[in-house]
Structures are given as C-alpha cells and as structure tokens.
C-alpha cells in the first residue's frame, strides 16, 4: 500500500466521559448544519426477517432474537468458513460532482462478538461504505470486503474494522482500524475485546473538516477506544454508495466467533453551505479533538 497517501490518525484510550463529550459534539455539529440539499436517516432498534430496507448477503440473516447475525451459527455454535454482510437498501448520495459538496454522516450501532474459545478468535466485523453493486468478497481475514491485502483505488471502499485475528498484514493484537481501499488498515489502535459483551460504536464524518472519528465503548467497564483520521471521501468513494456491515469467521477449525448487530442508526446530510460555515465547522471539529 502507498502509506504516504494514507491519513494520519489519533489513536488512544480515553475515559467514557471524554468519548461521550466528543461524540455529542460531533453529533450536534452534524445535526445543526443548514442549507441541507439531501438527507437520509434511519434507525433500527431491532431487526425483523424479510425486512425490505435490508440487503442480506452470504450467510447473514436476522435471528429469532431480532439481531443481525452476520455469520453462520449451527447447533448454537459459530462455524468456520462463514462470511456475511448486511446493507441498507437505499443508496446514499455521499458527494455531488456538480457542486463538489460532500455529505457529513453519523452512524451508531451496538454489536456483540462472542467466541467459544477466547484464545481462538477470528476474524472480525466491519462497518463499511462501498459502491451500490458491492458483493461479498473473500472470507477469513479479508472480512468479506476485499480479495487481497494490496492497496487498490478501484476498490472504492472505506471501512472501520474490529479485528480479532492477527493476519500477516495486521498488528499482533486485536485492534480497531480504518481501511481505505485495502484490508491493511491505514492505522490501528489496540482493542481490548470483551467476550460476549455489548459494544457501542459511534462513527462520525464531518465533511467540512474532512474528519472521520470512530469510537467504541464498553458500558460495563466504561472503557473506550478512539481513532481519528483526515479522510477525503471524494478521492475514495463513488458519488453513490451503500452502507452496512460485513463479518467473517476463520478458515481453520476452532477459530470462530459470532458477529451480531443489535441496533443501528444512520444519518447523512449532503450540504451546500457557504465557506464561512465550513470554516466554523472545521474549527469546531479541530477543537473537539484537543
């Protein structure tokens, strides 16, 4: 991969209160913008079978508990060689070539990764944006998103991964990473995965500041993990994308886990705003990271 073209990231572990303050700041920043050109918003507090708003790929299904079960479970146990994805059915207008404007977005979701053996976990789950016709890719460490670890701008994929297995292109520990057109993350932060516990994720993109922030919090321990990146969506994604989740289990027997999404909300707003508003928003975004 061309590391020189990849964004700088802030990686840290912060108390829950700090993450909450940052999250609220960015959420309000997005919602208080004016001159909206297009907006898309949806919320799933639970999921139901045959839901028109969802496109399920691979092994993904809605469980009897109303959860998005991305990888296969047989007789109560996760199995290897499984990959599944779930996407929102309506494409998102993420940027406009006629005006040059780029959408801001915020998404929040809860998920659980549970493994029978804490010493044999694989492979992880990701939230991603990709072209509307995106299909399942390779399983295992590629998380159903890519077929190679080589950076390729034609992939047109932006993802935030929650990775439980160390592949050859990964750091040596479980981690959170931001992926730009490659499964080899641009930067990573160590993730203290907690087996079977609910994680709360907030991912925000503030277009005027070209800033992407991802945070994961375990309420049970008030432990949080944060990544921040400068990301130019126009250089990565097509104008229209689909958003969703992808997950995969390991290729070897025993290296398995469940990947269940419990709830999900998403809001995007494509703005026309003036330059002064953009400067003010960019300043606020920068200030929130100090």
UniProtKB/Swiss-Prot annotation:
Pfam families: Lectin_legB (PF00139). Residues 1-36 form the signal peptide. Glycans are attached at residues 119, 147, 152. Ca(2+) binds at residues 163, 167, 170. Mn(2+) binds at residues 161, 163, 170, 175. Keywords: Calcium, Glycoprotein, Lectin, Manganese, Metal-binding, Signal. One of its GO terms (molecular function) is carbohydrate binding. Does not have any carbohydrate binding or agglutination activity. Belongs to the leguminous lectin family. Homotetramer. PANTHER family: CONCANAVALIN A-LIKE LECTIN FAMILY PROTEIN, LECTIN. This is Lectin-related protein. It comes from Cladrastis kentukea (Yellow wood).
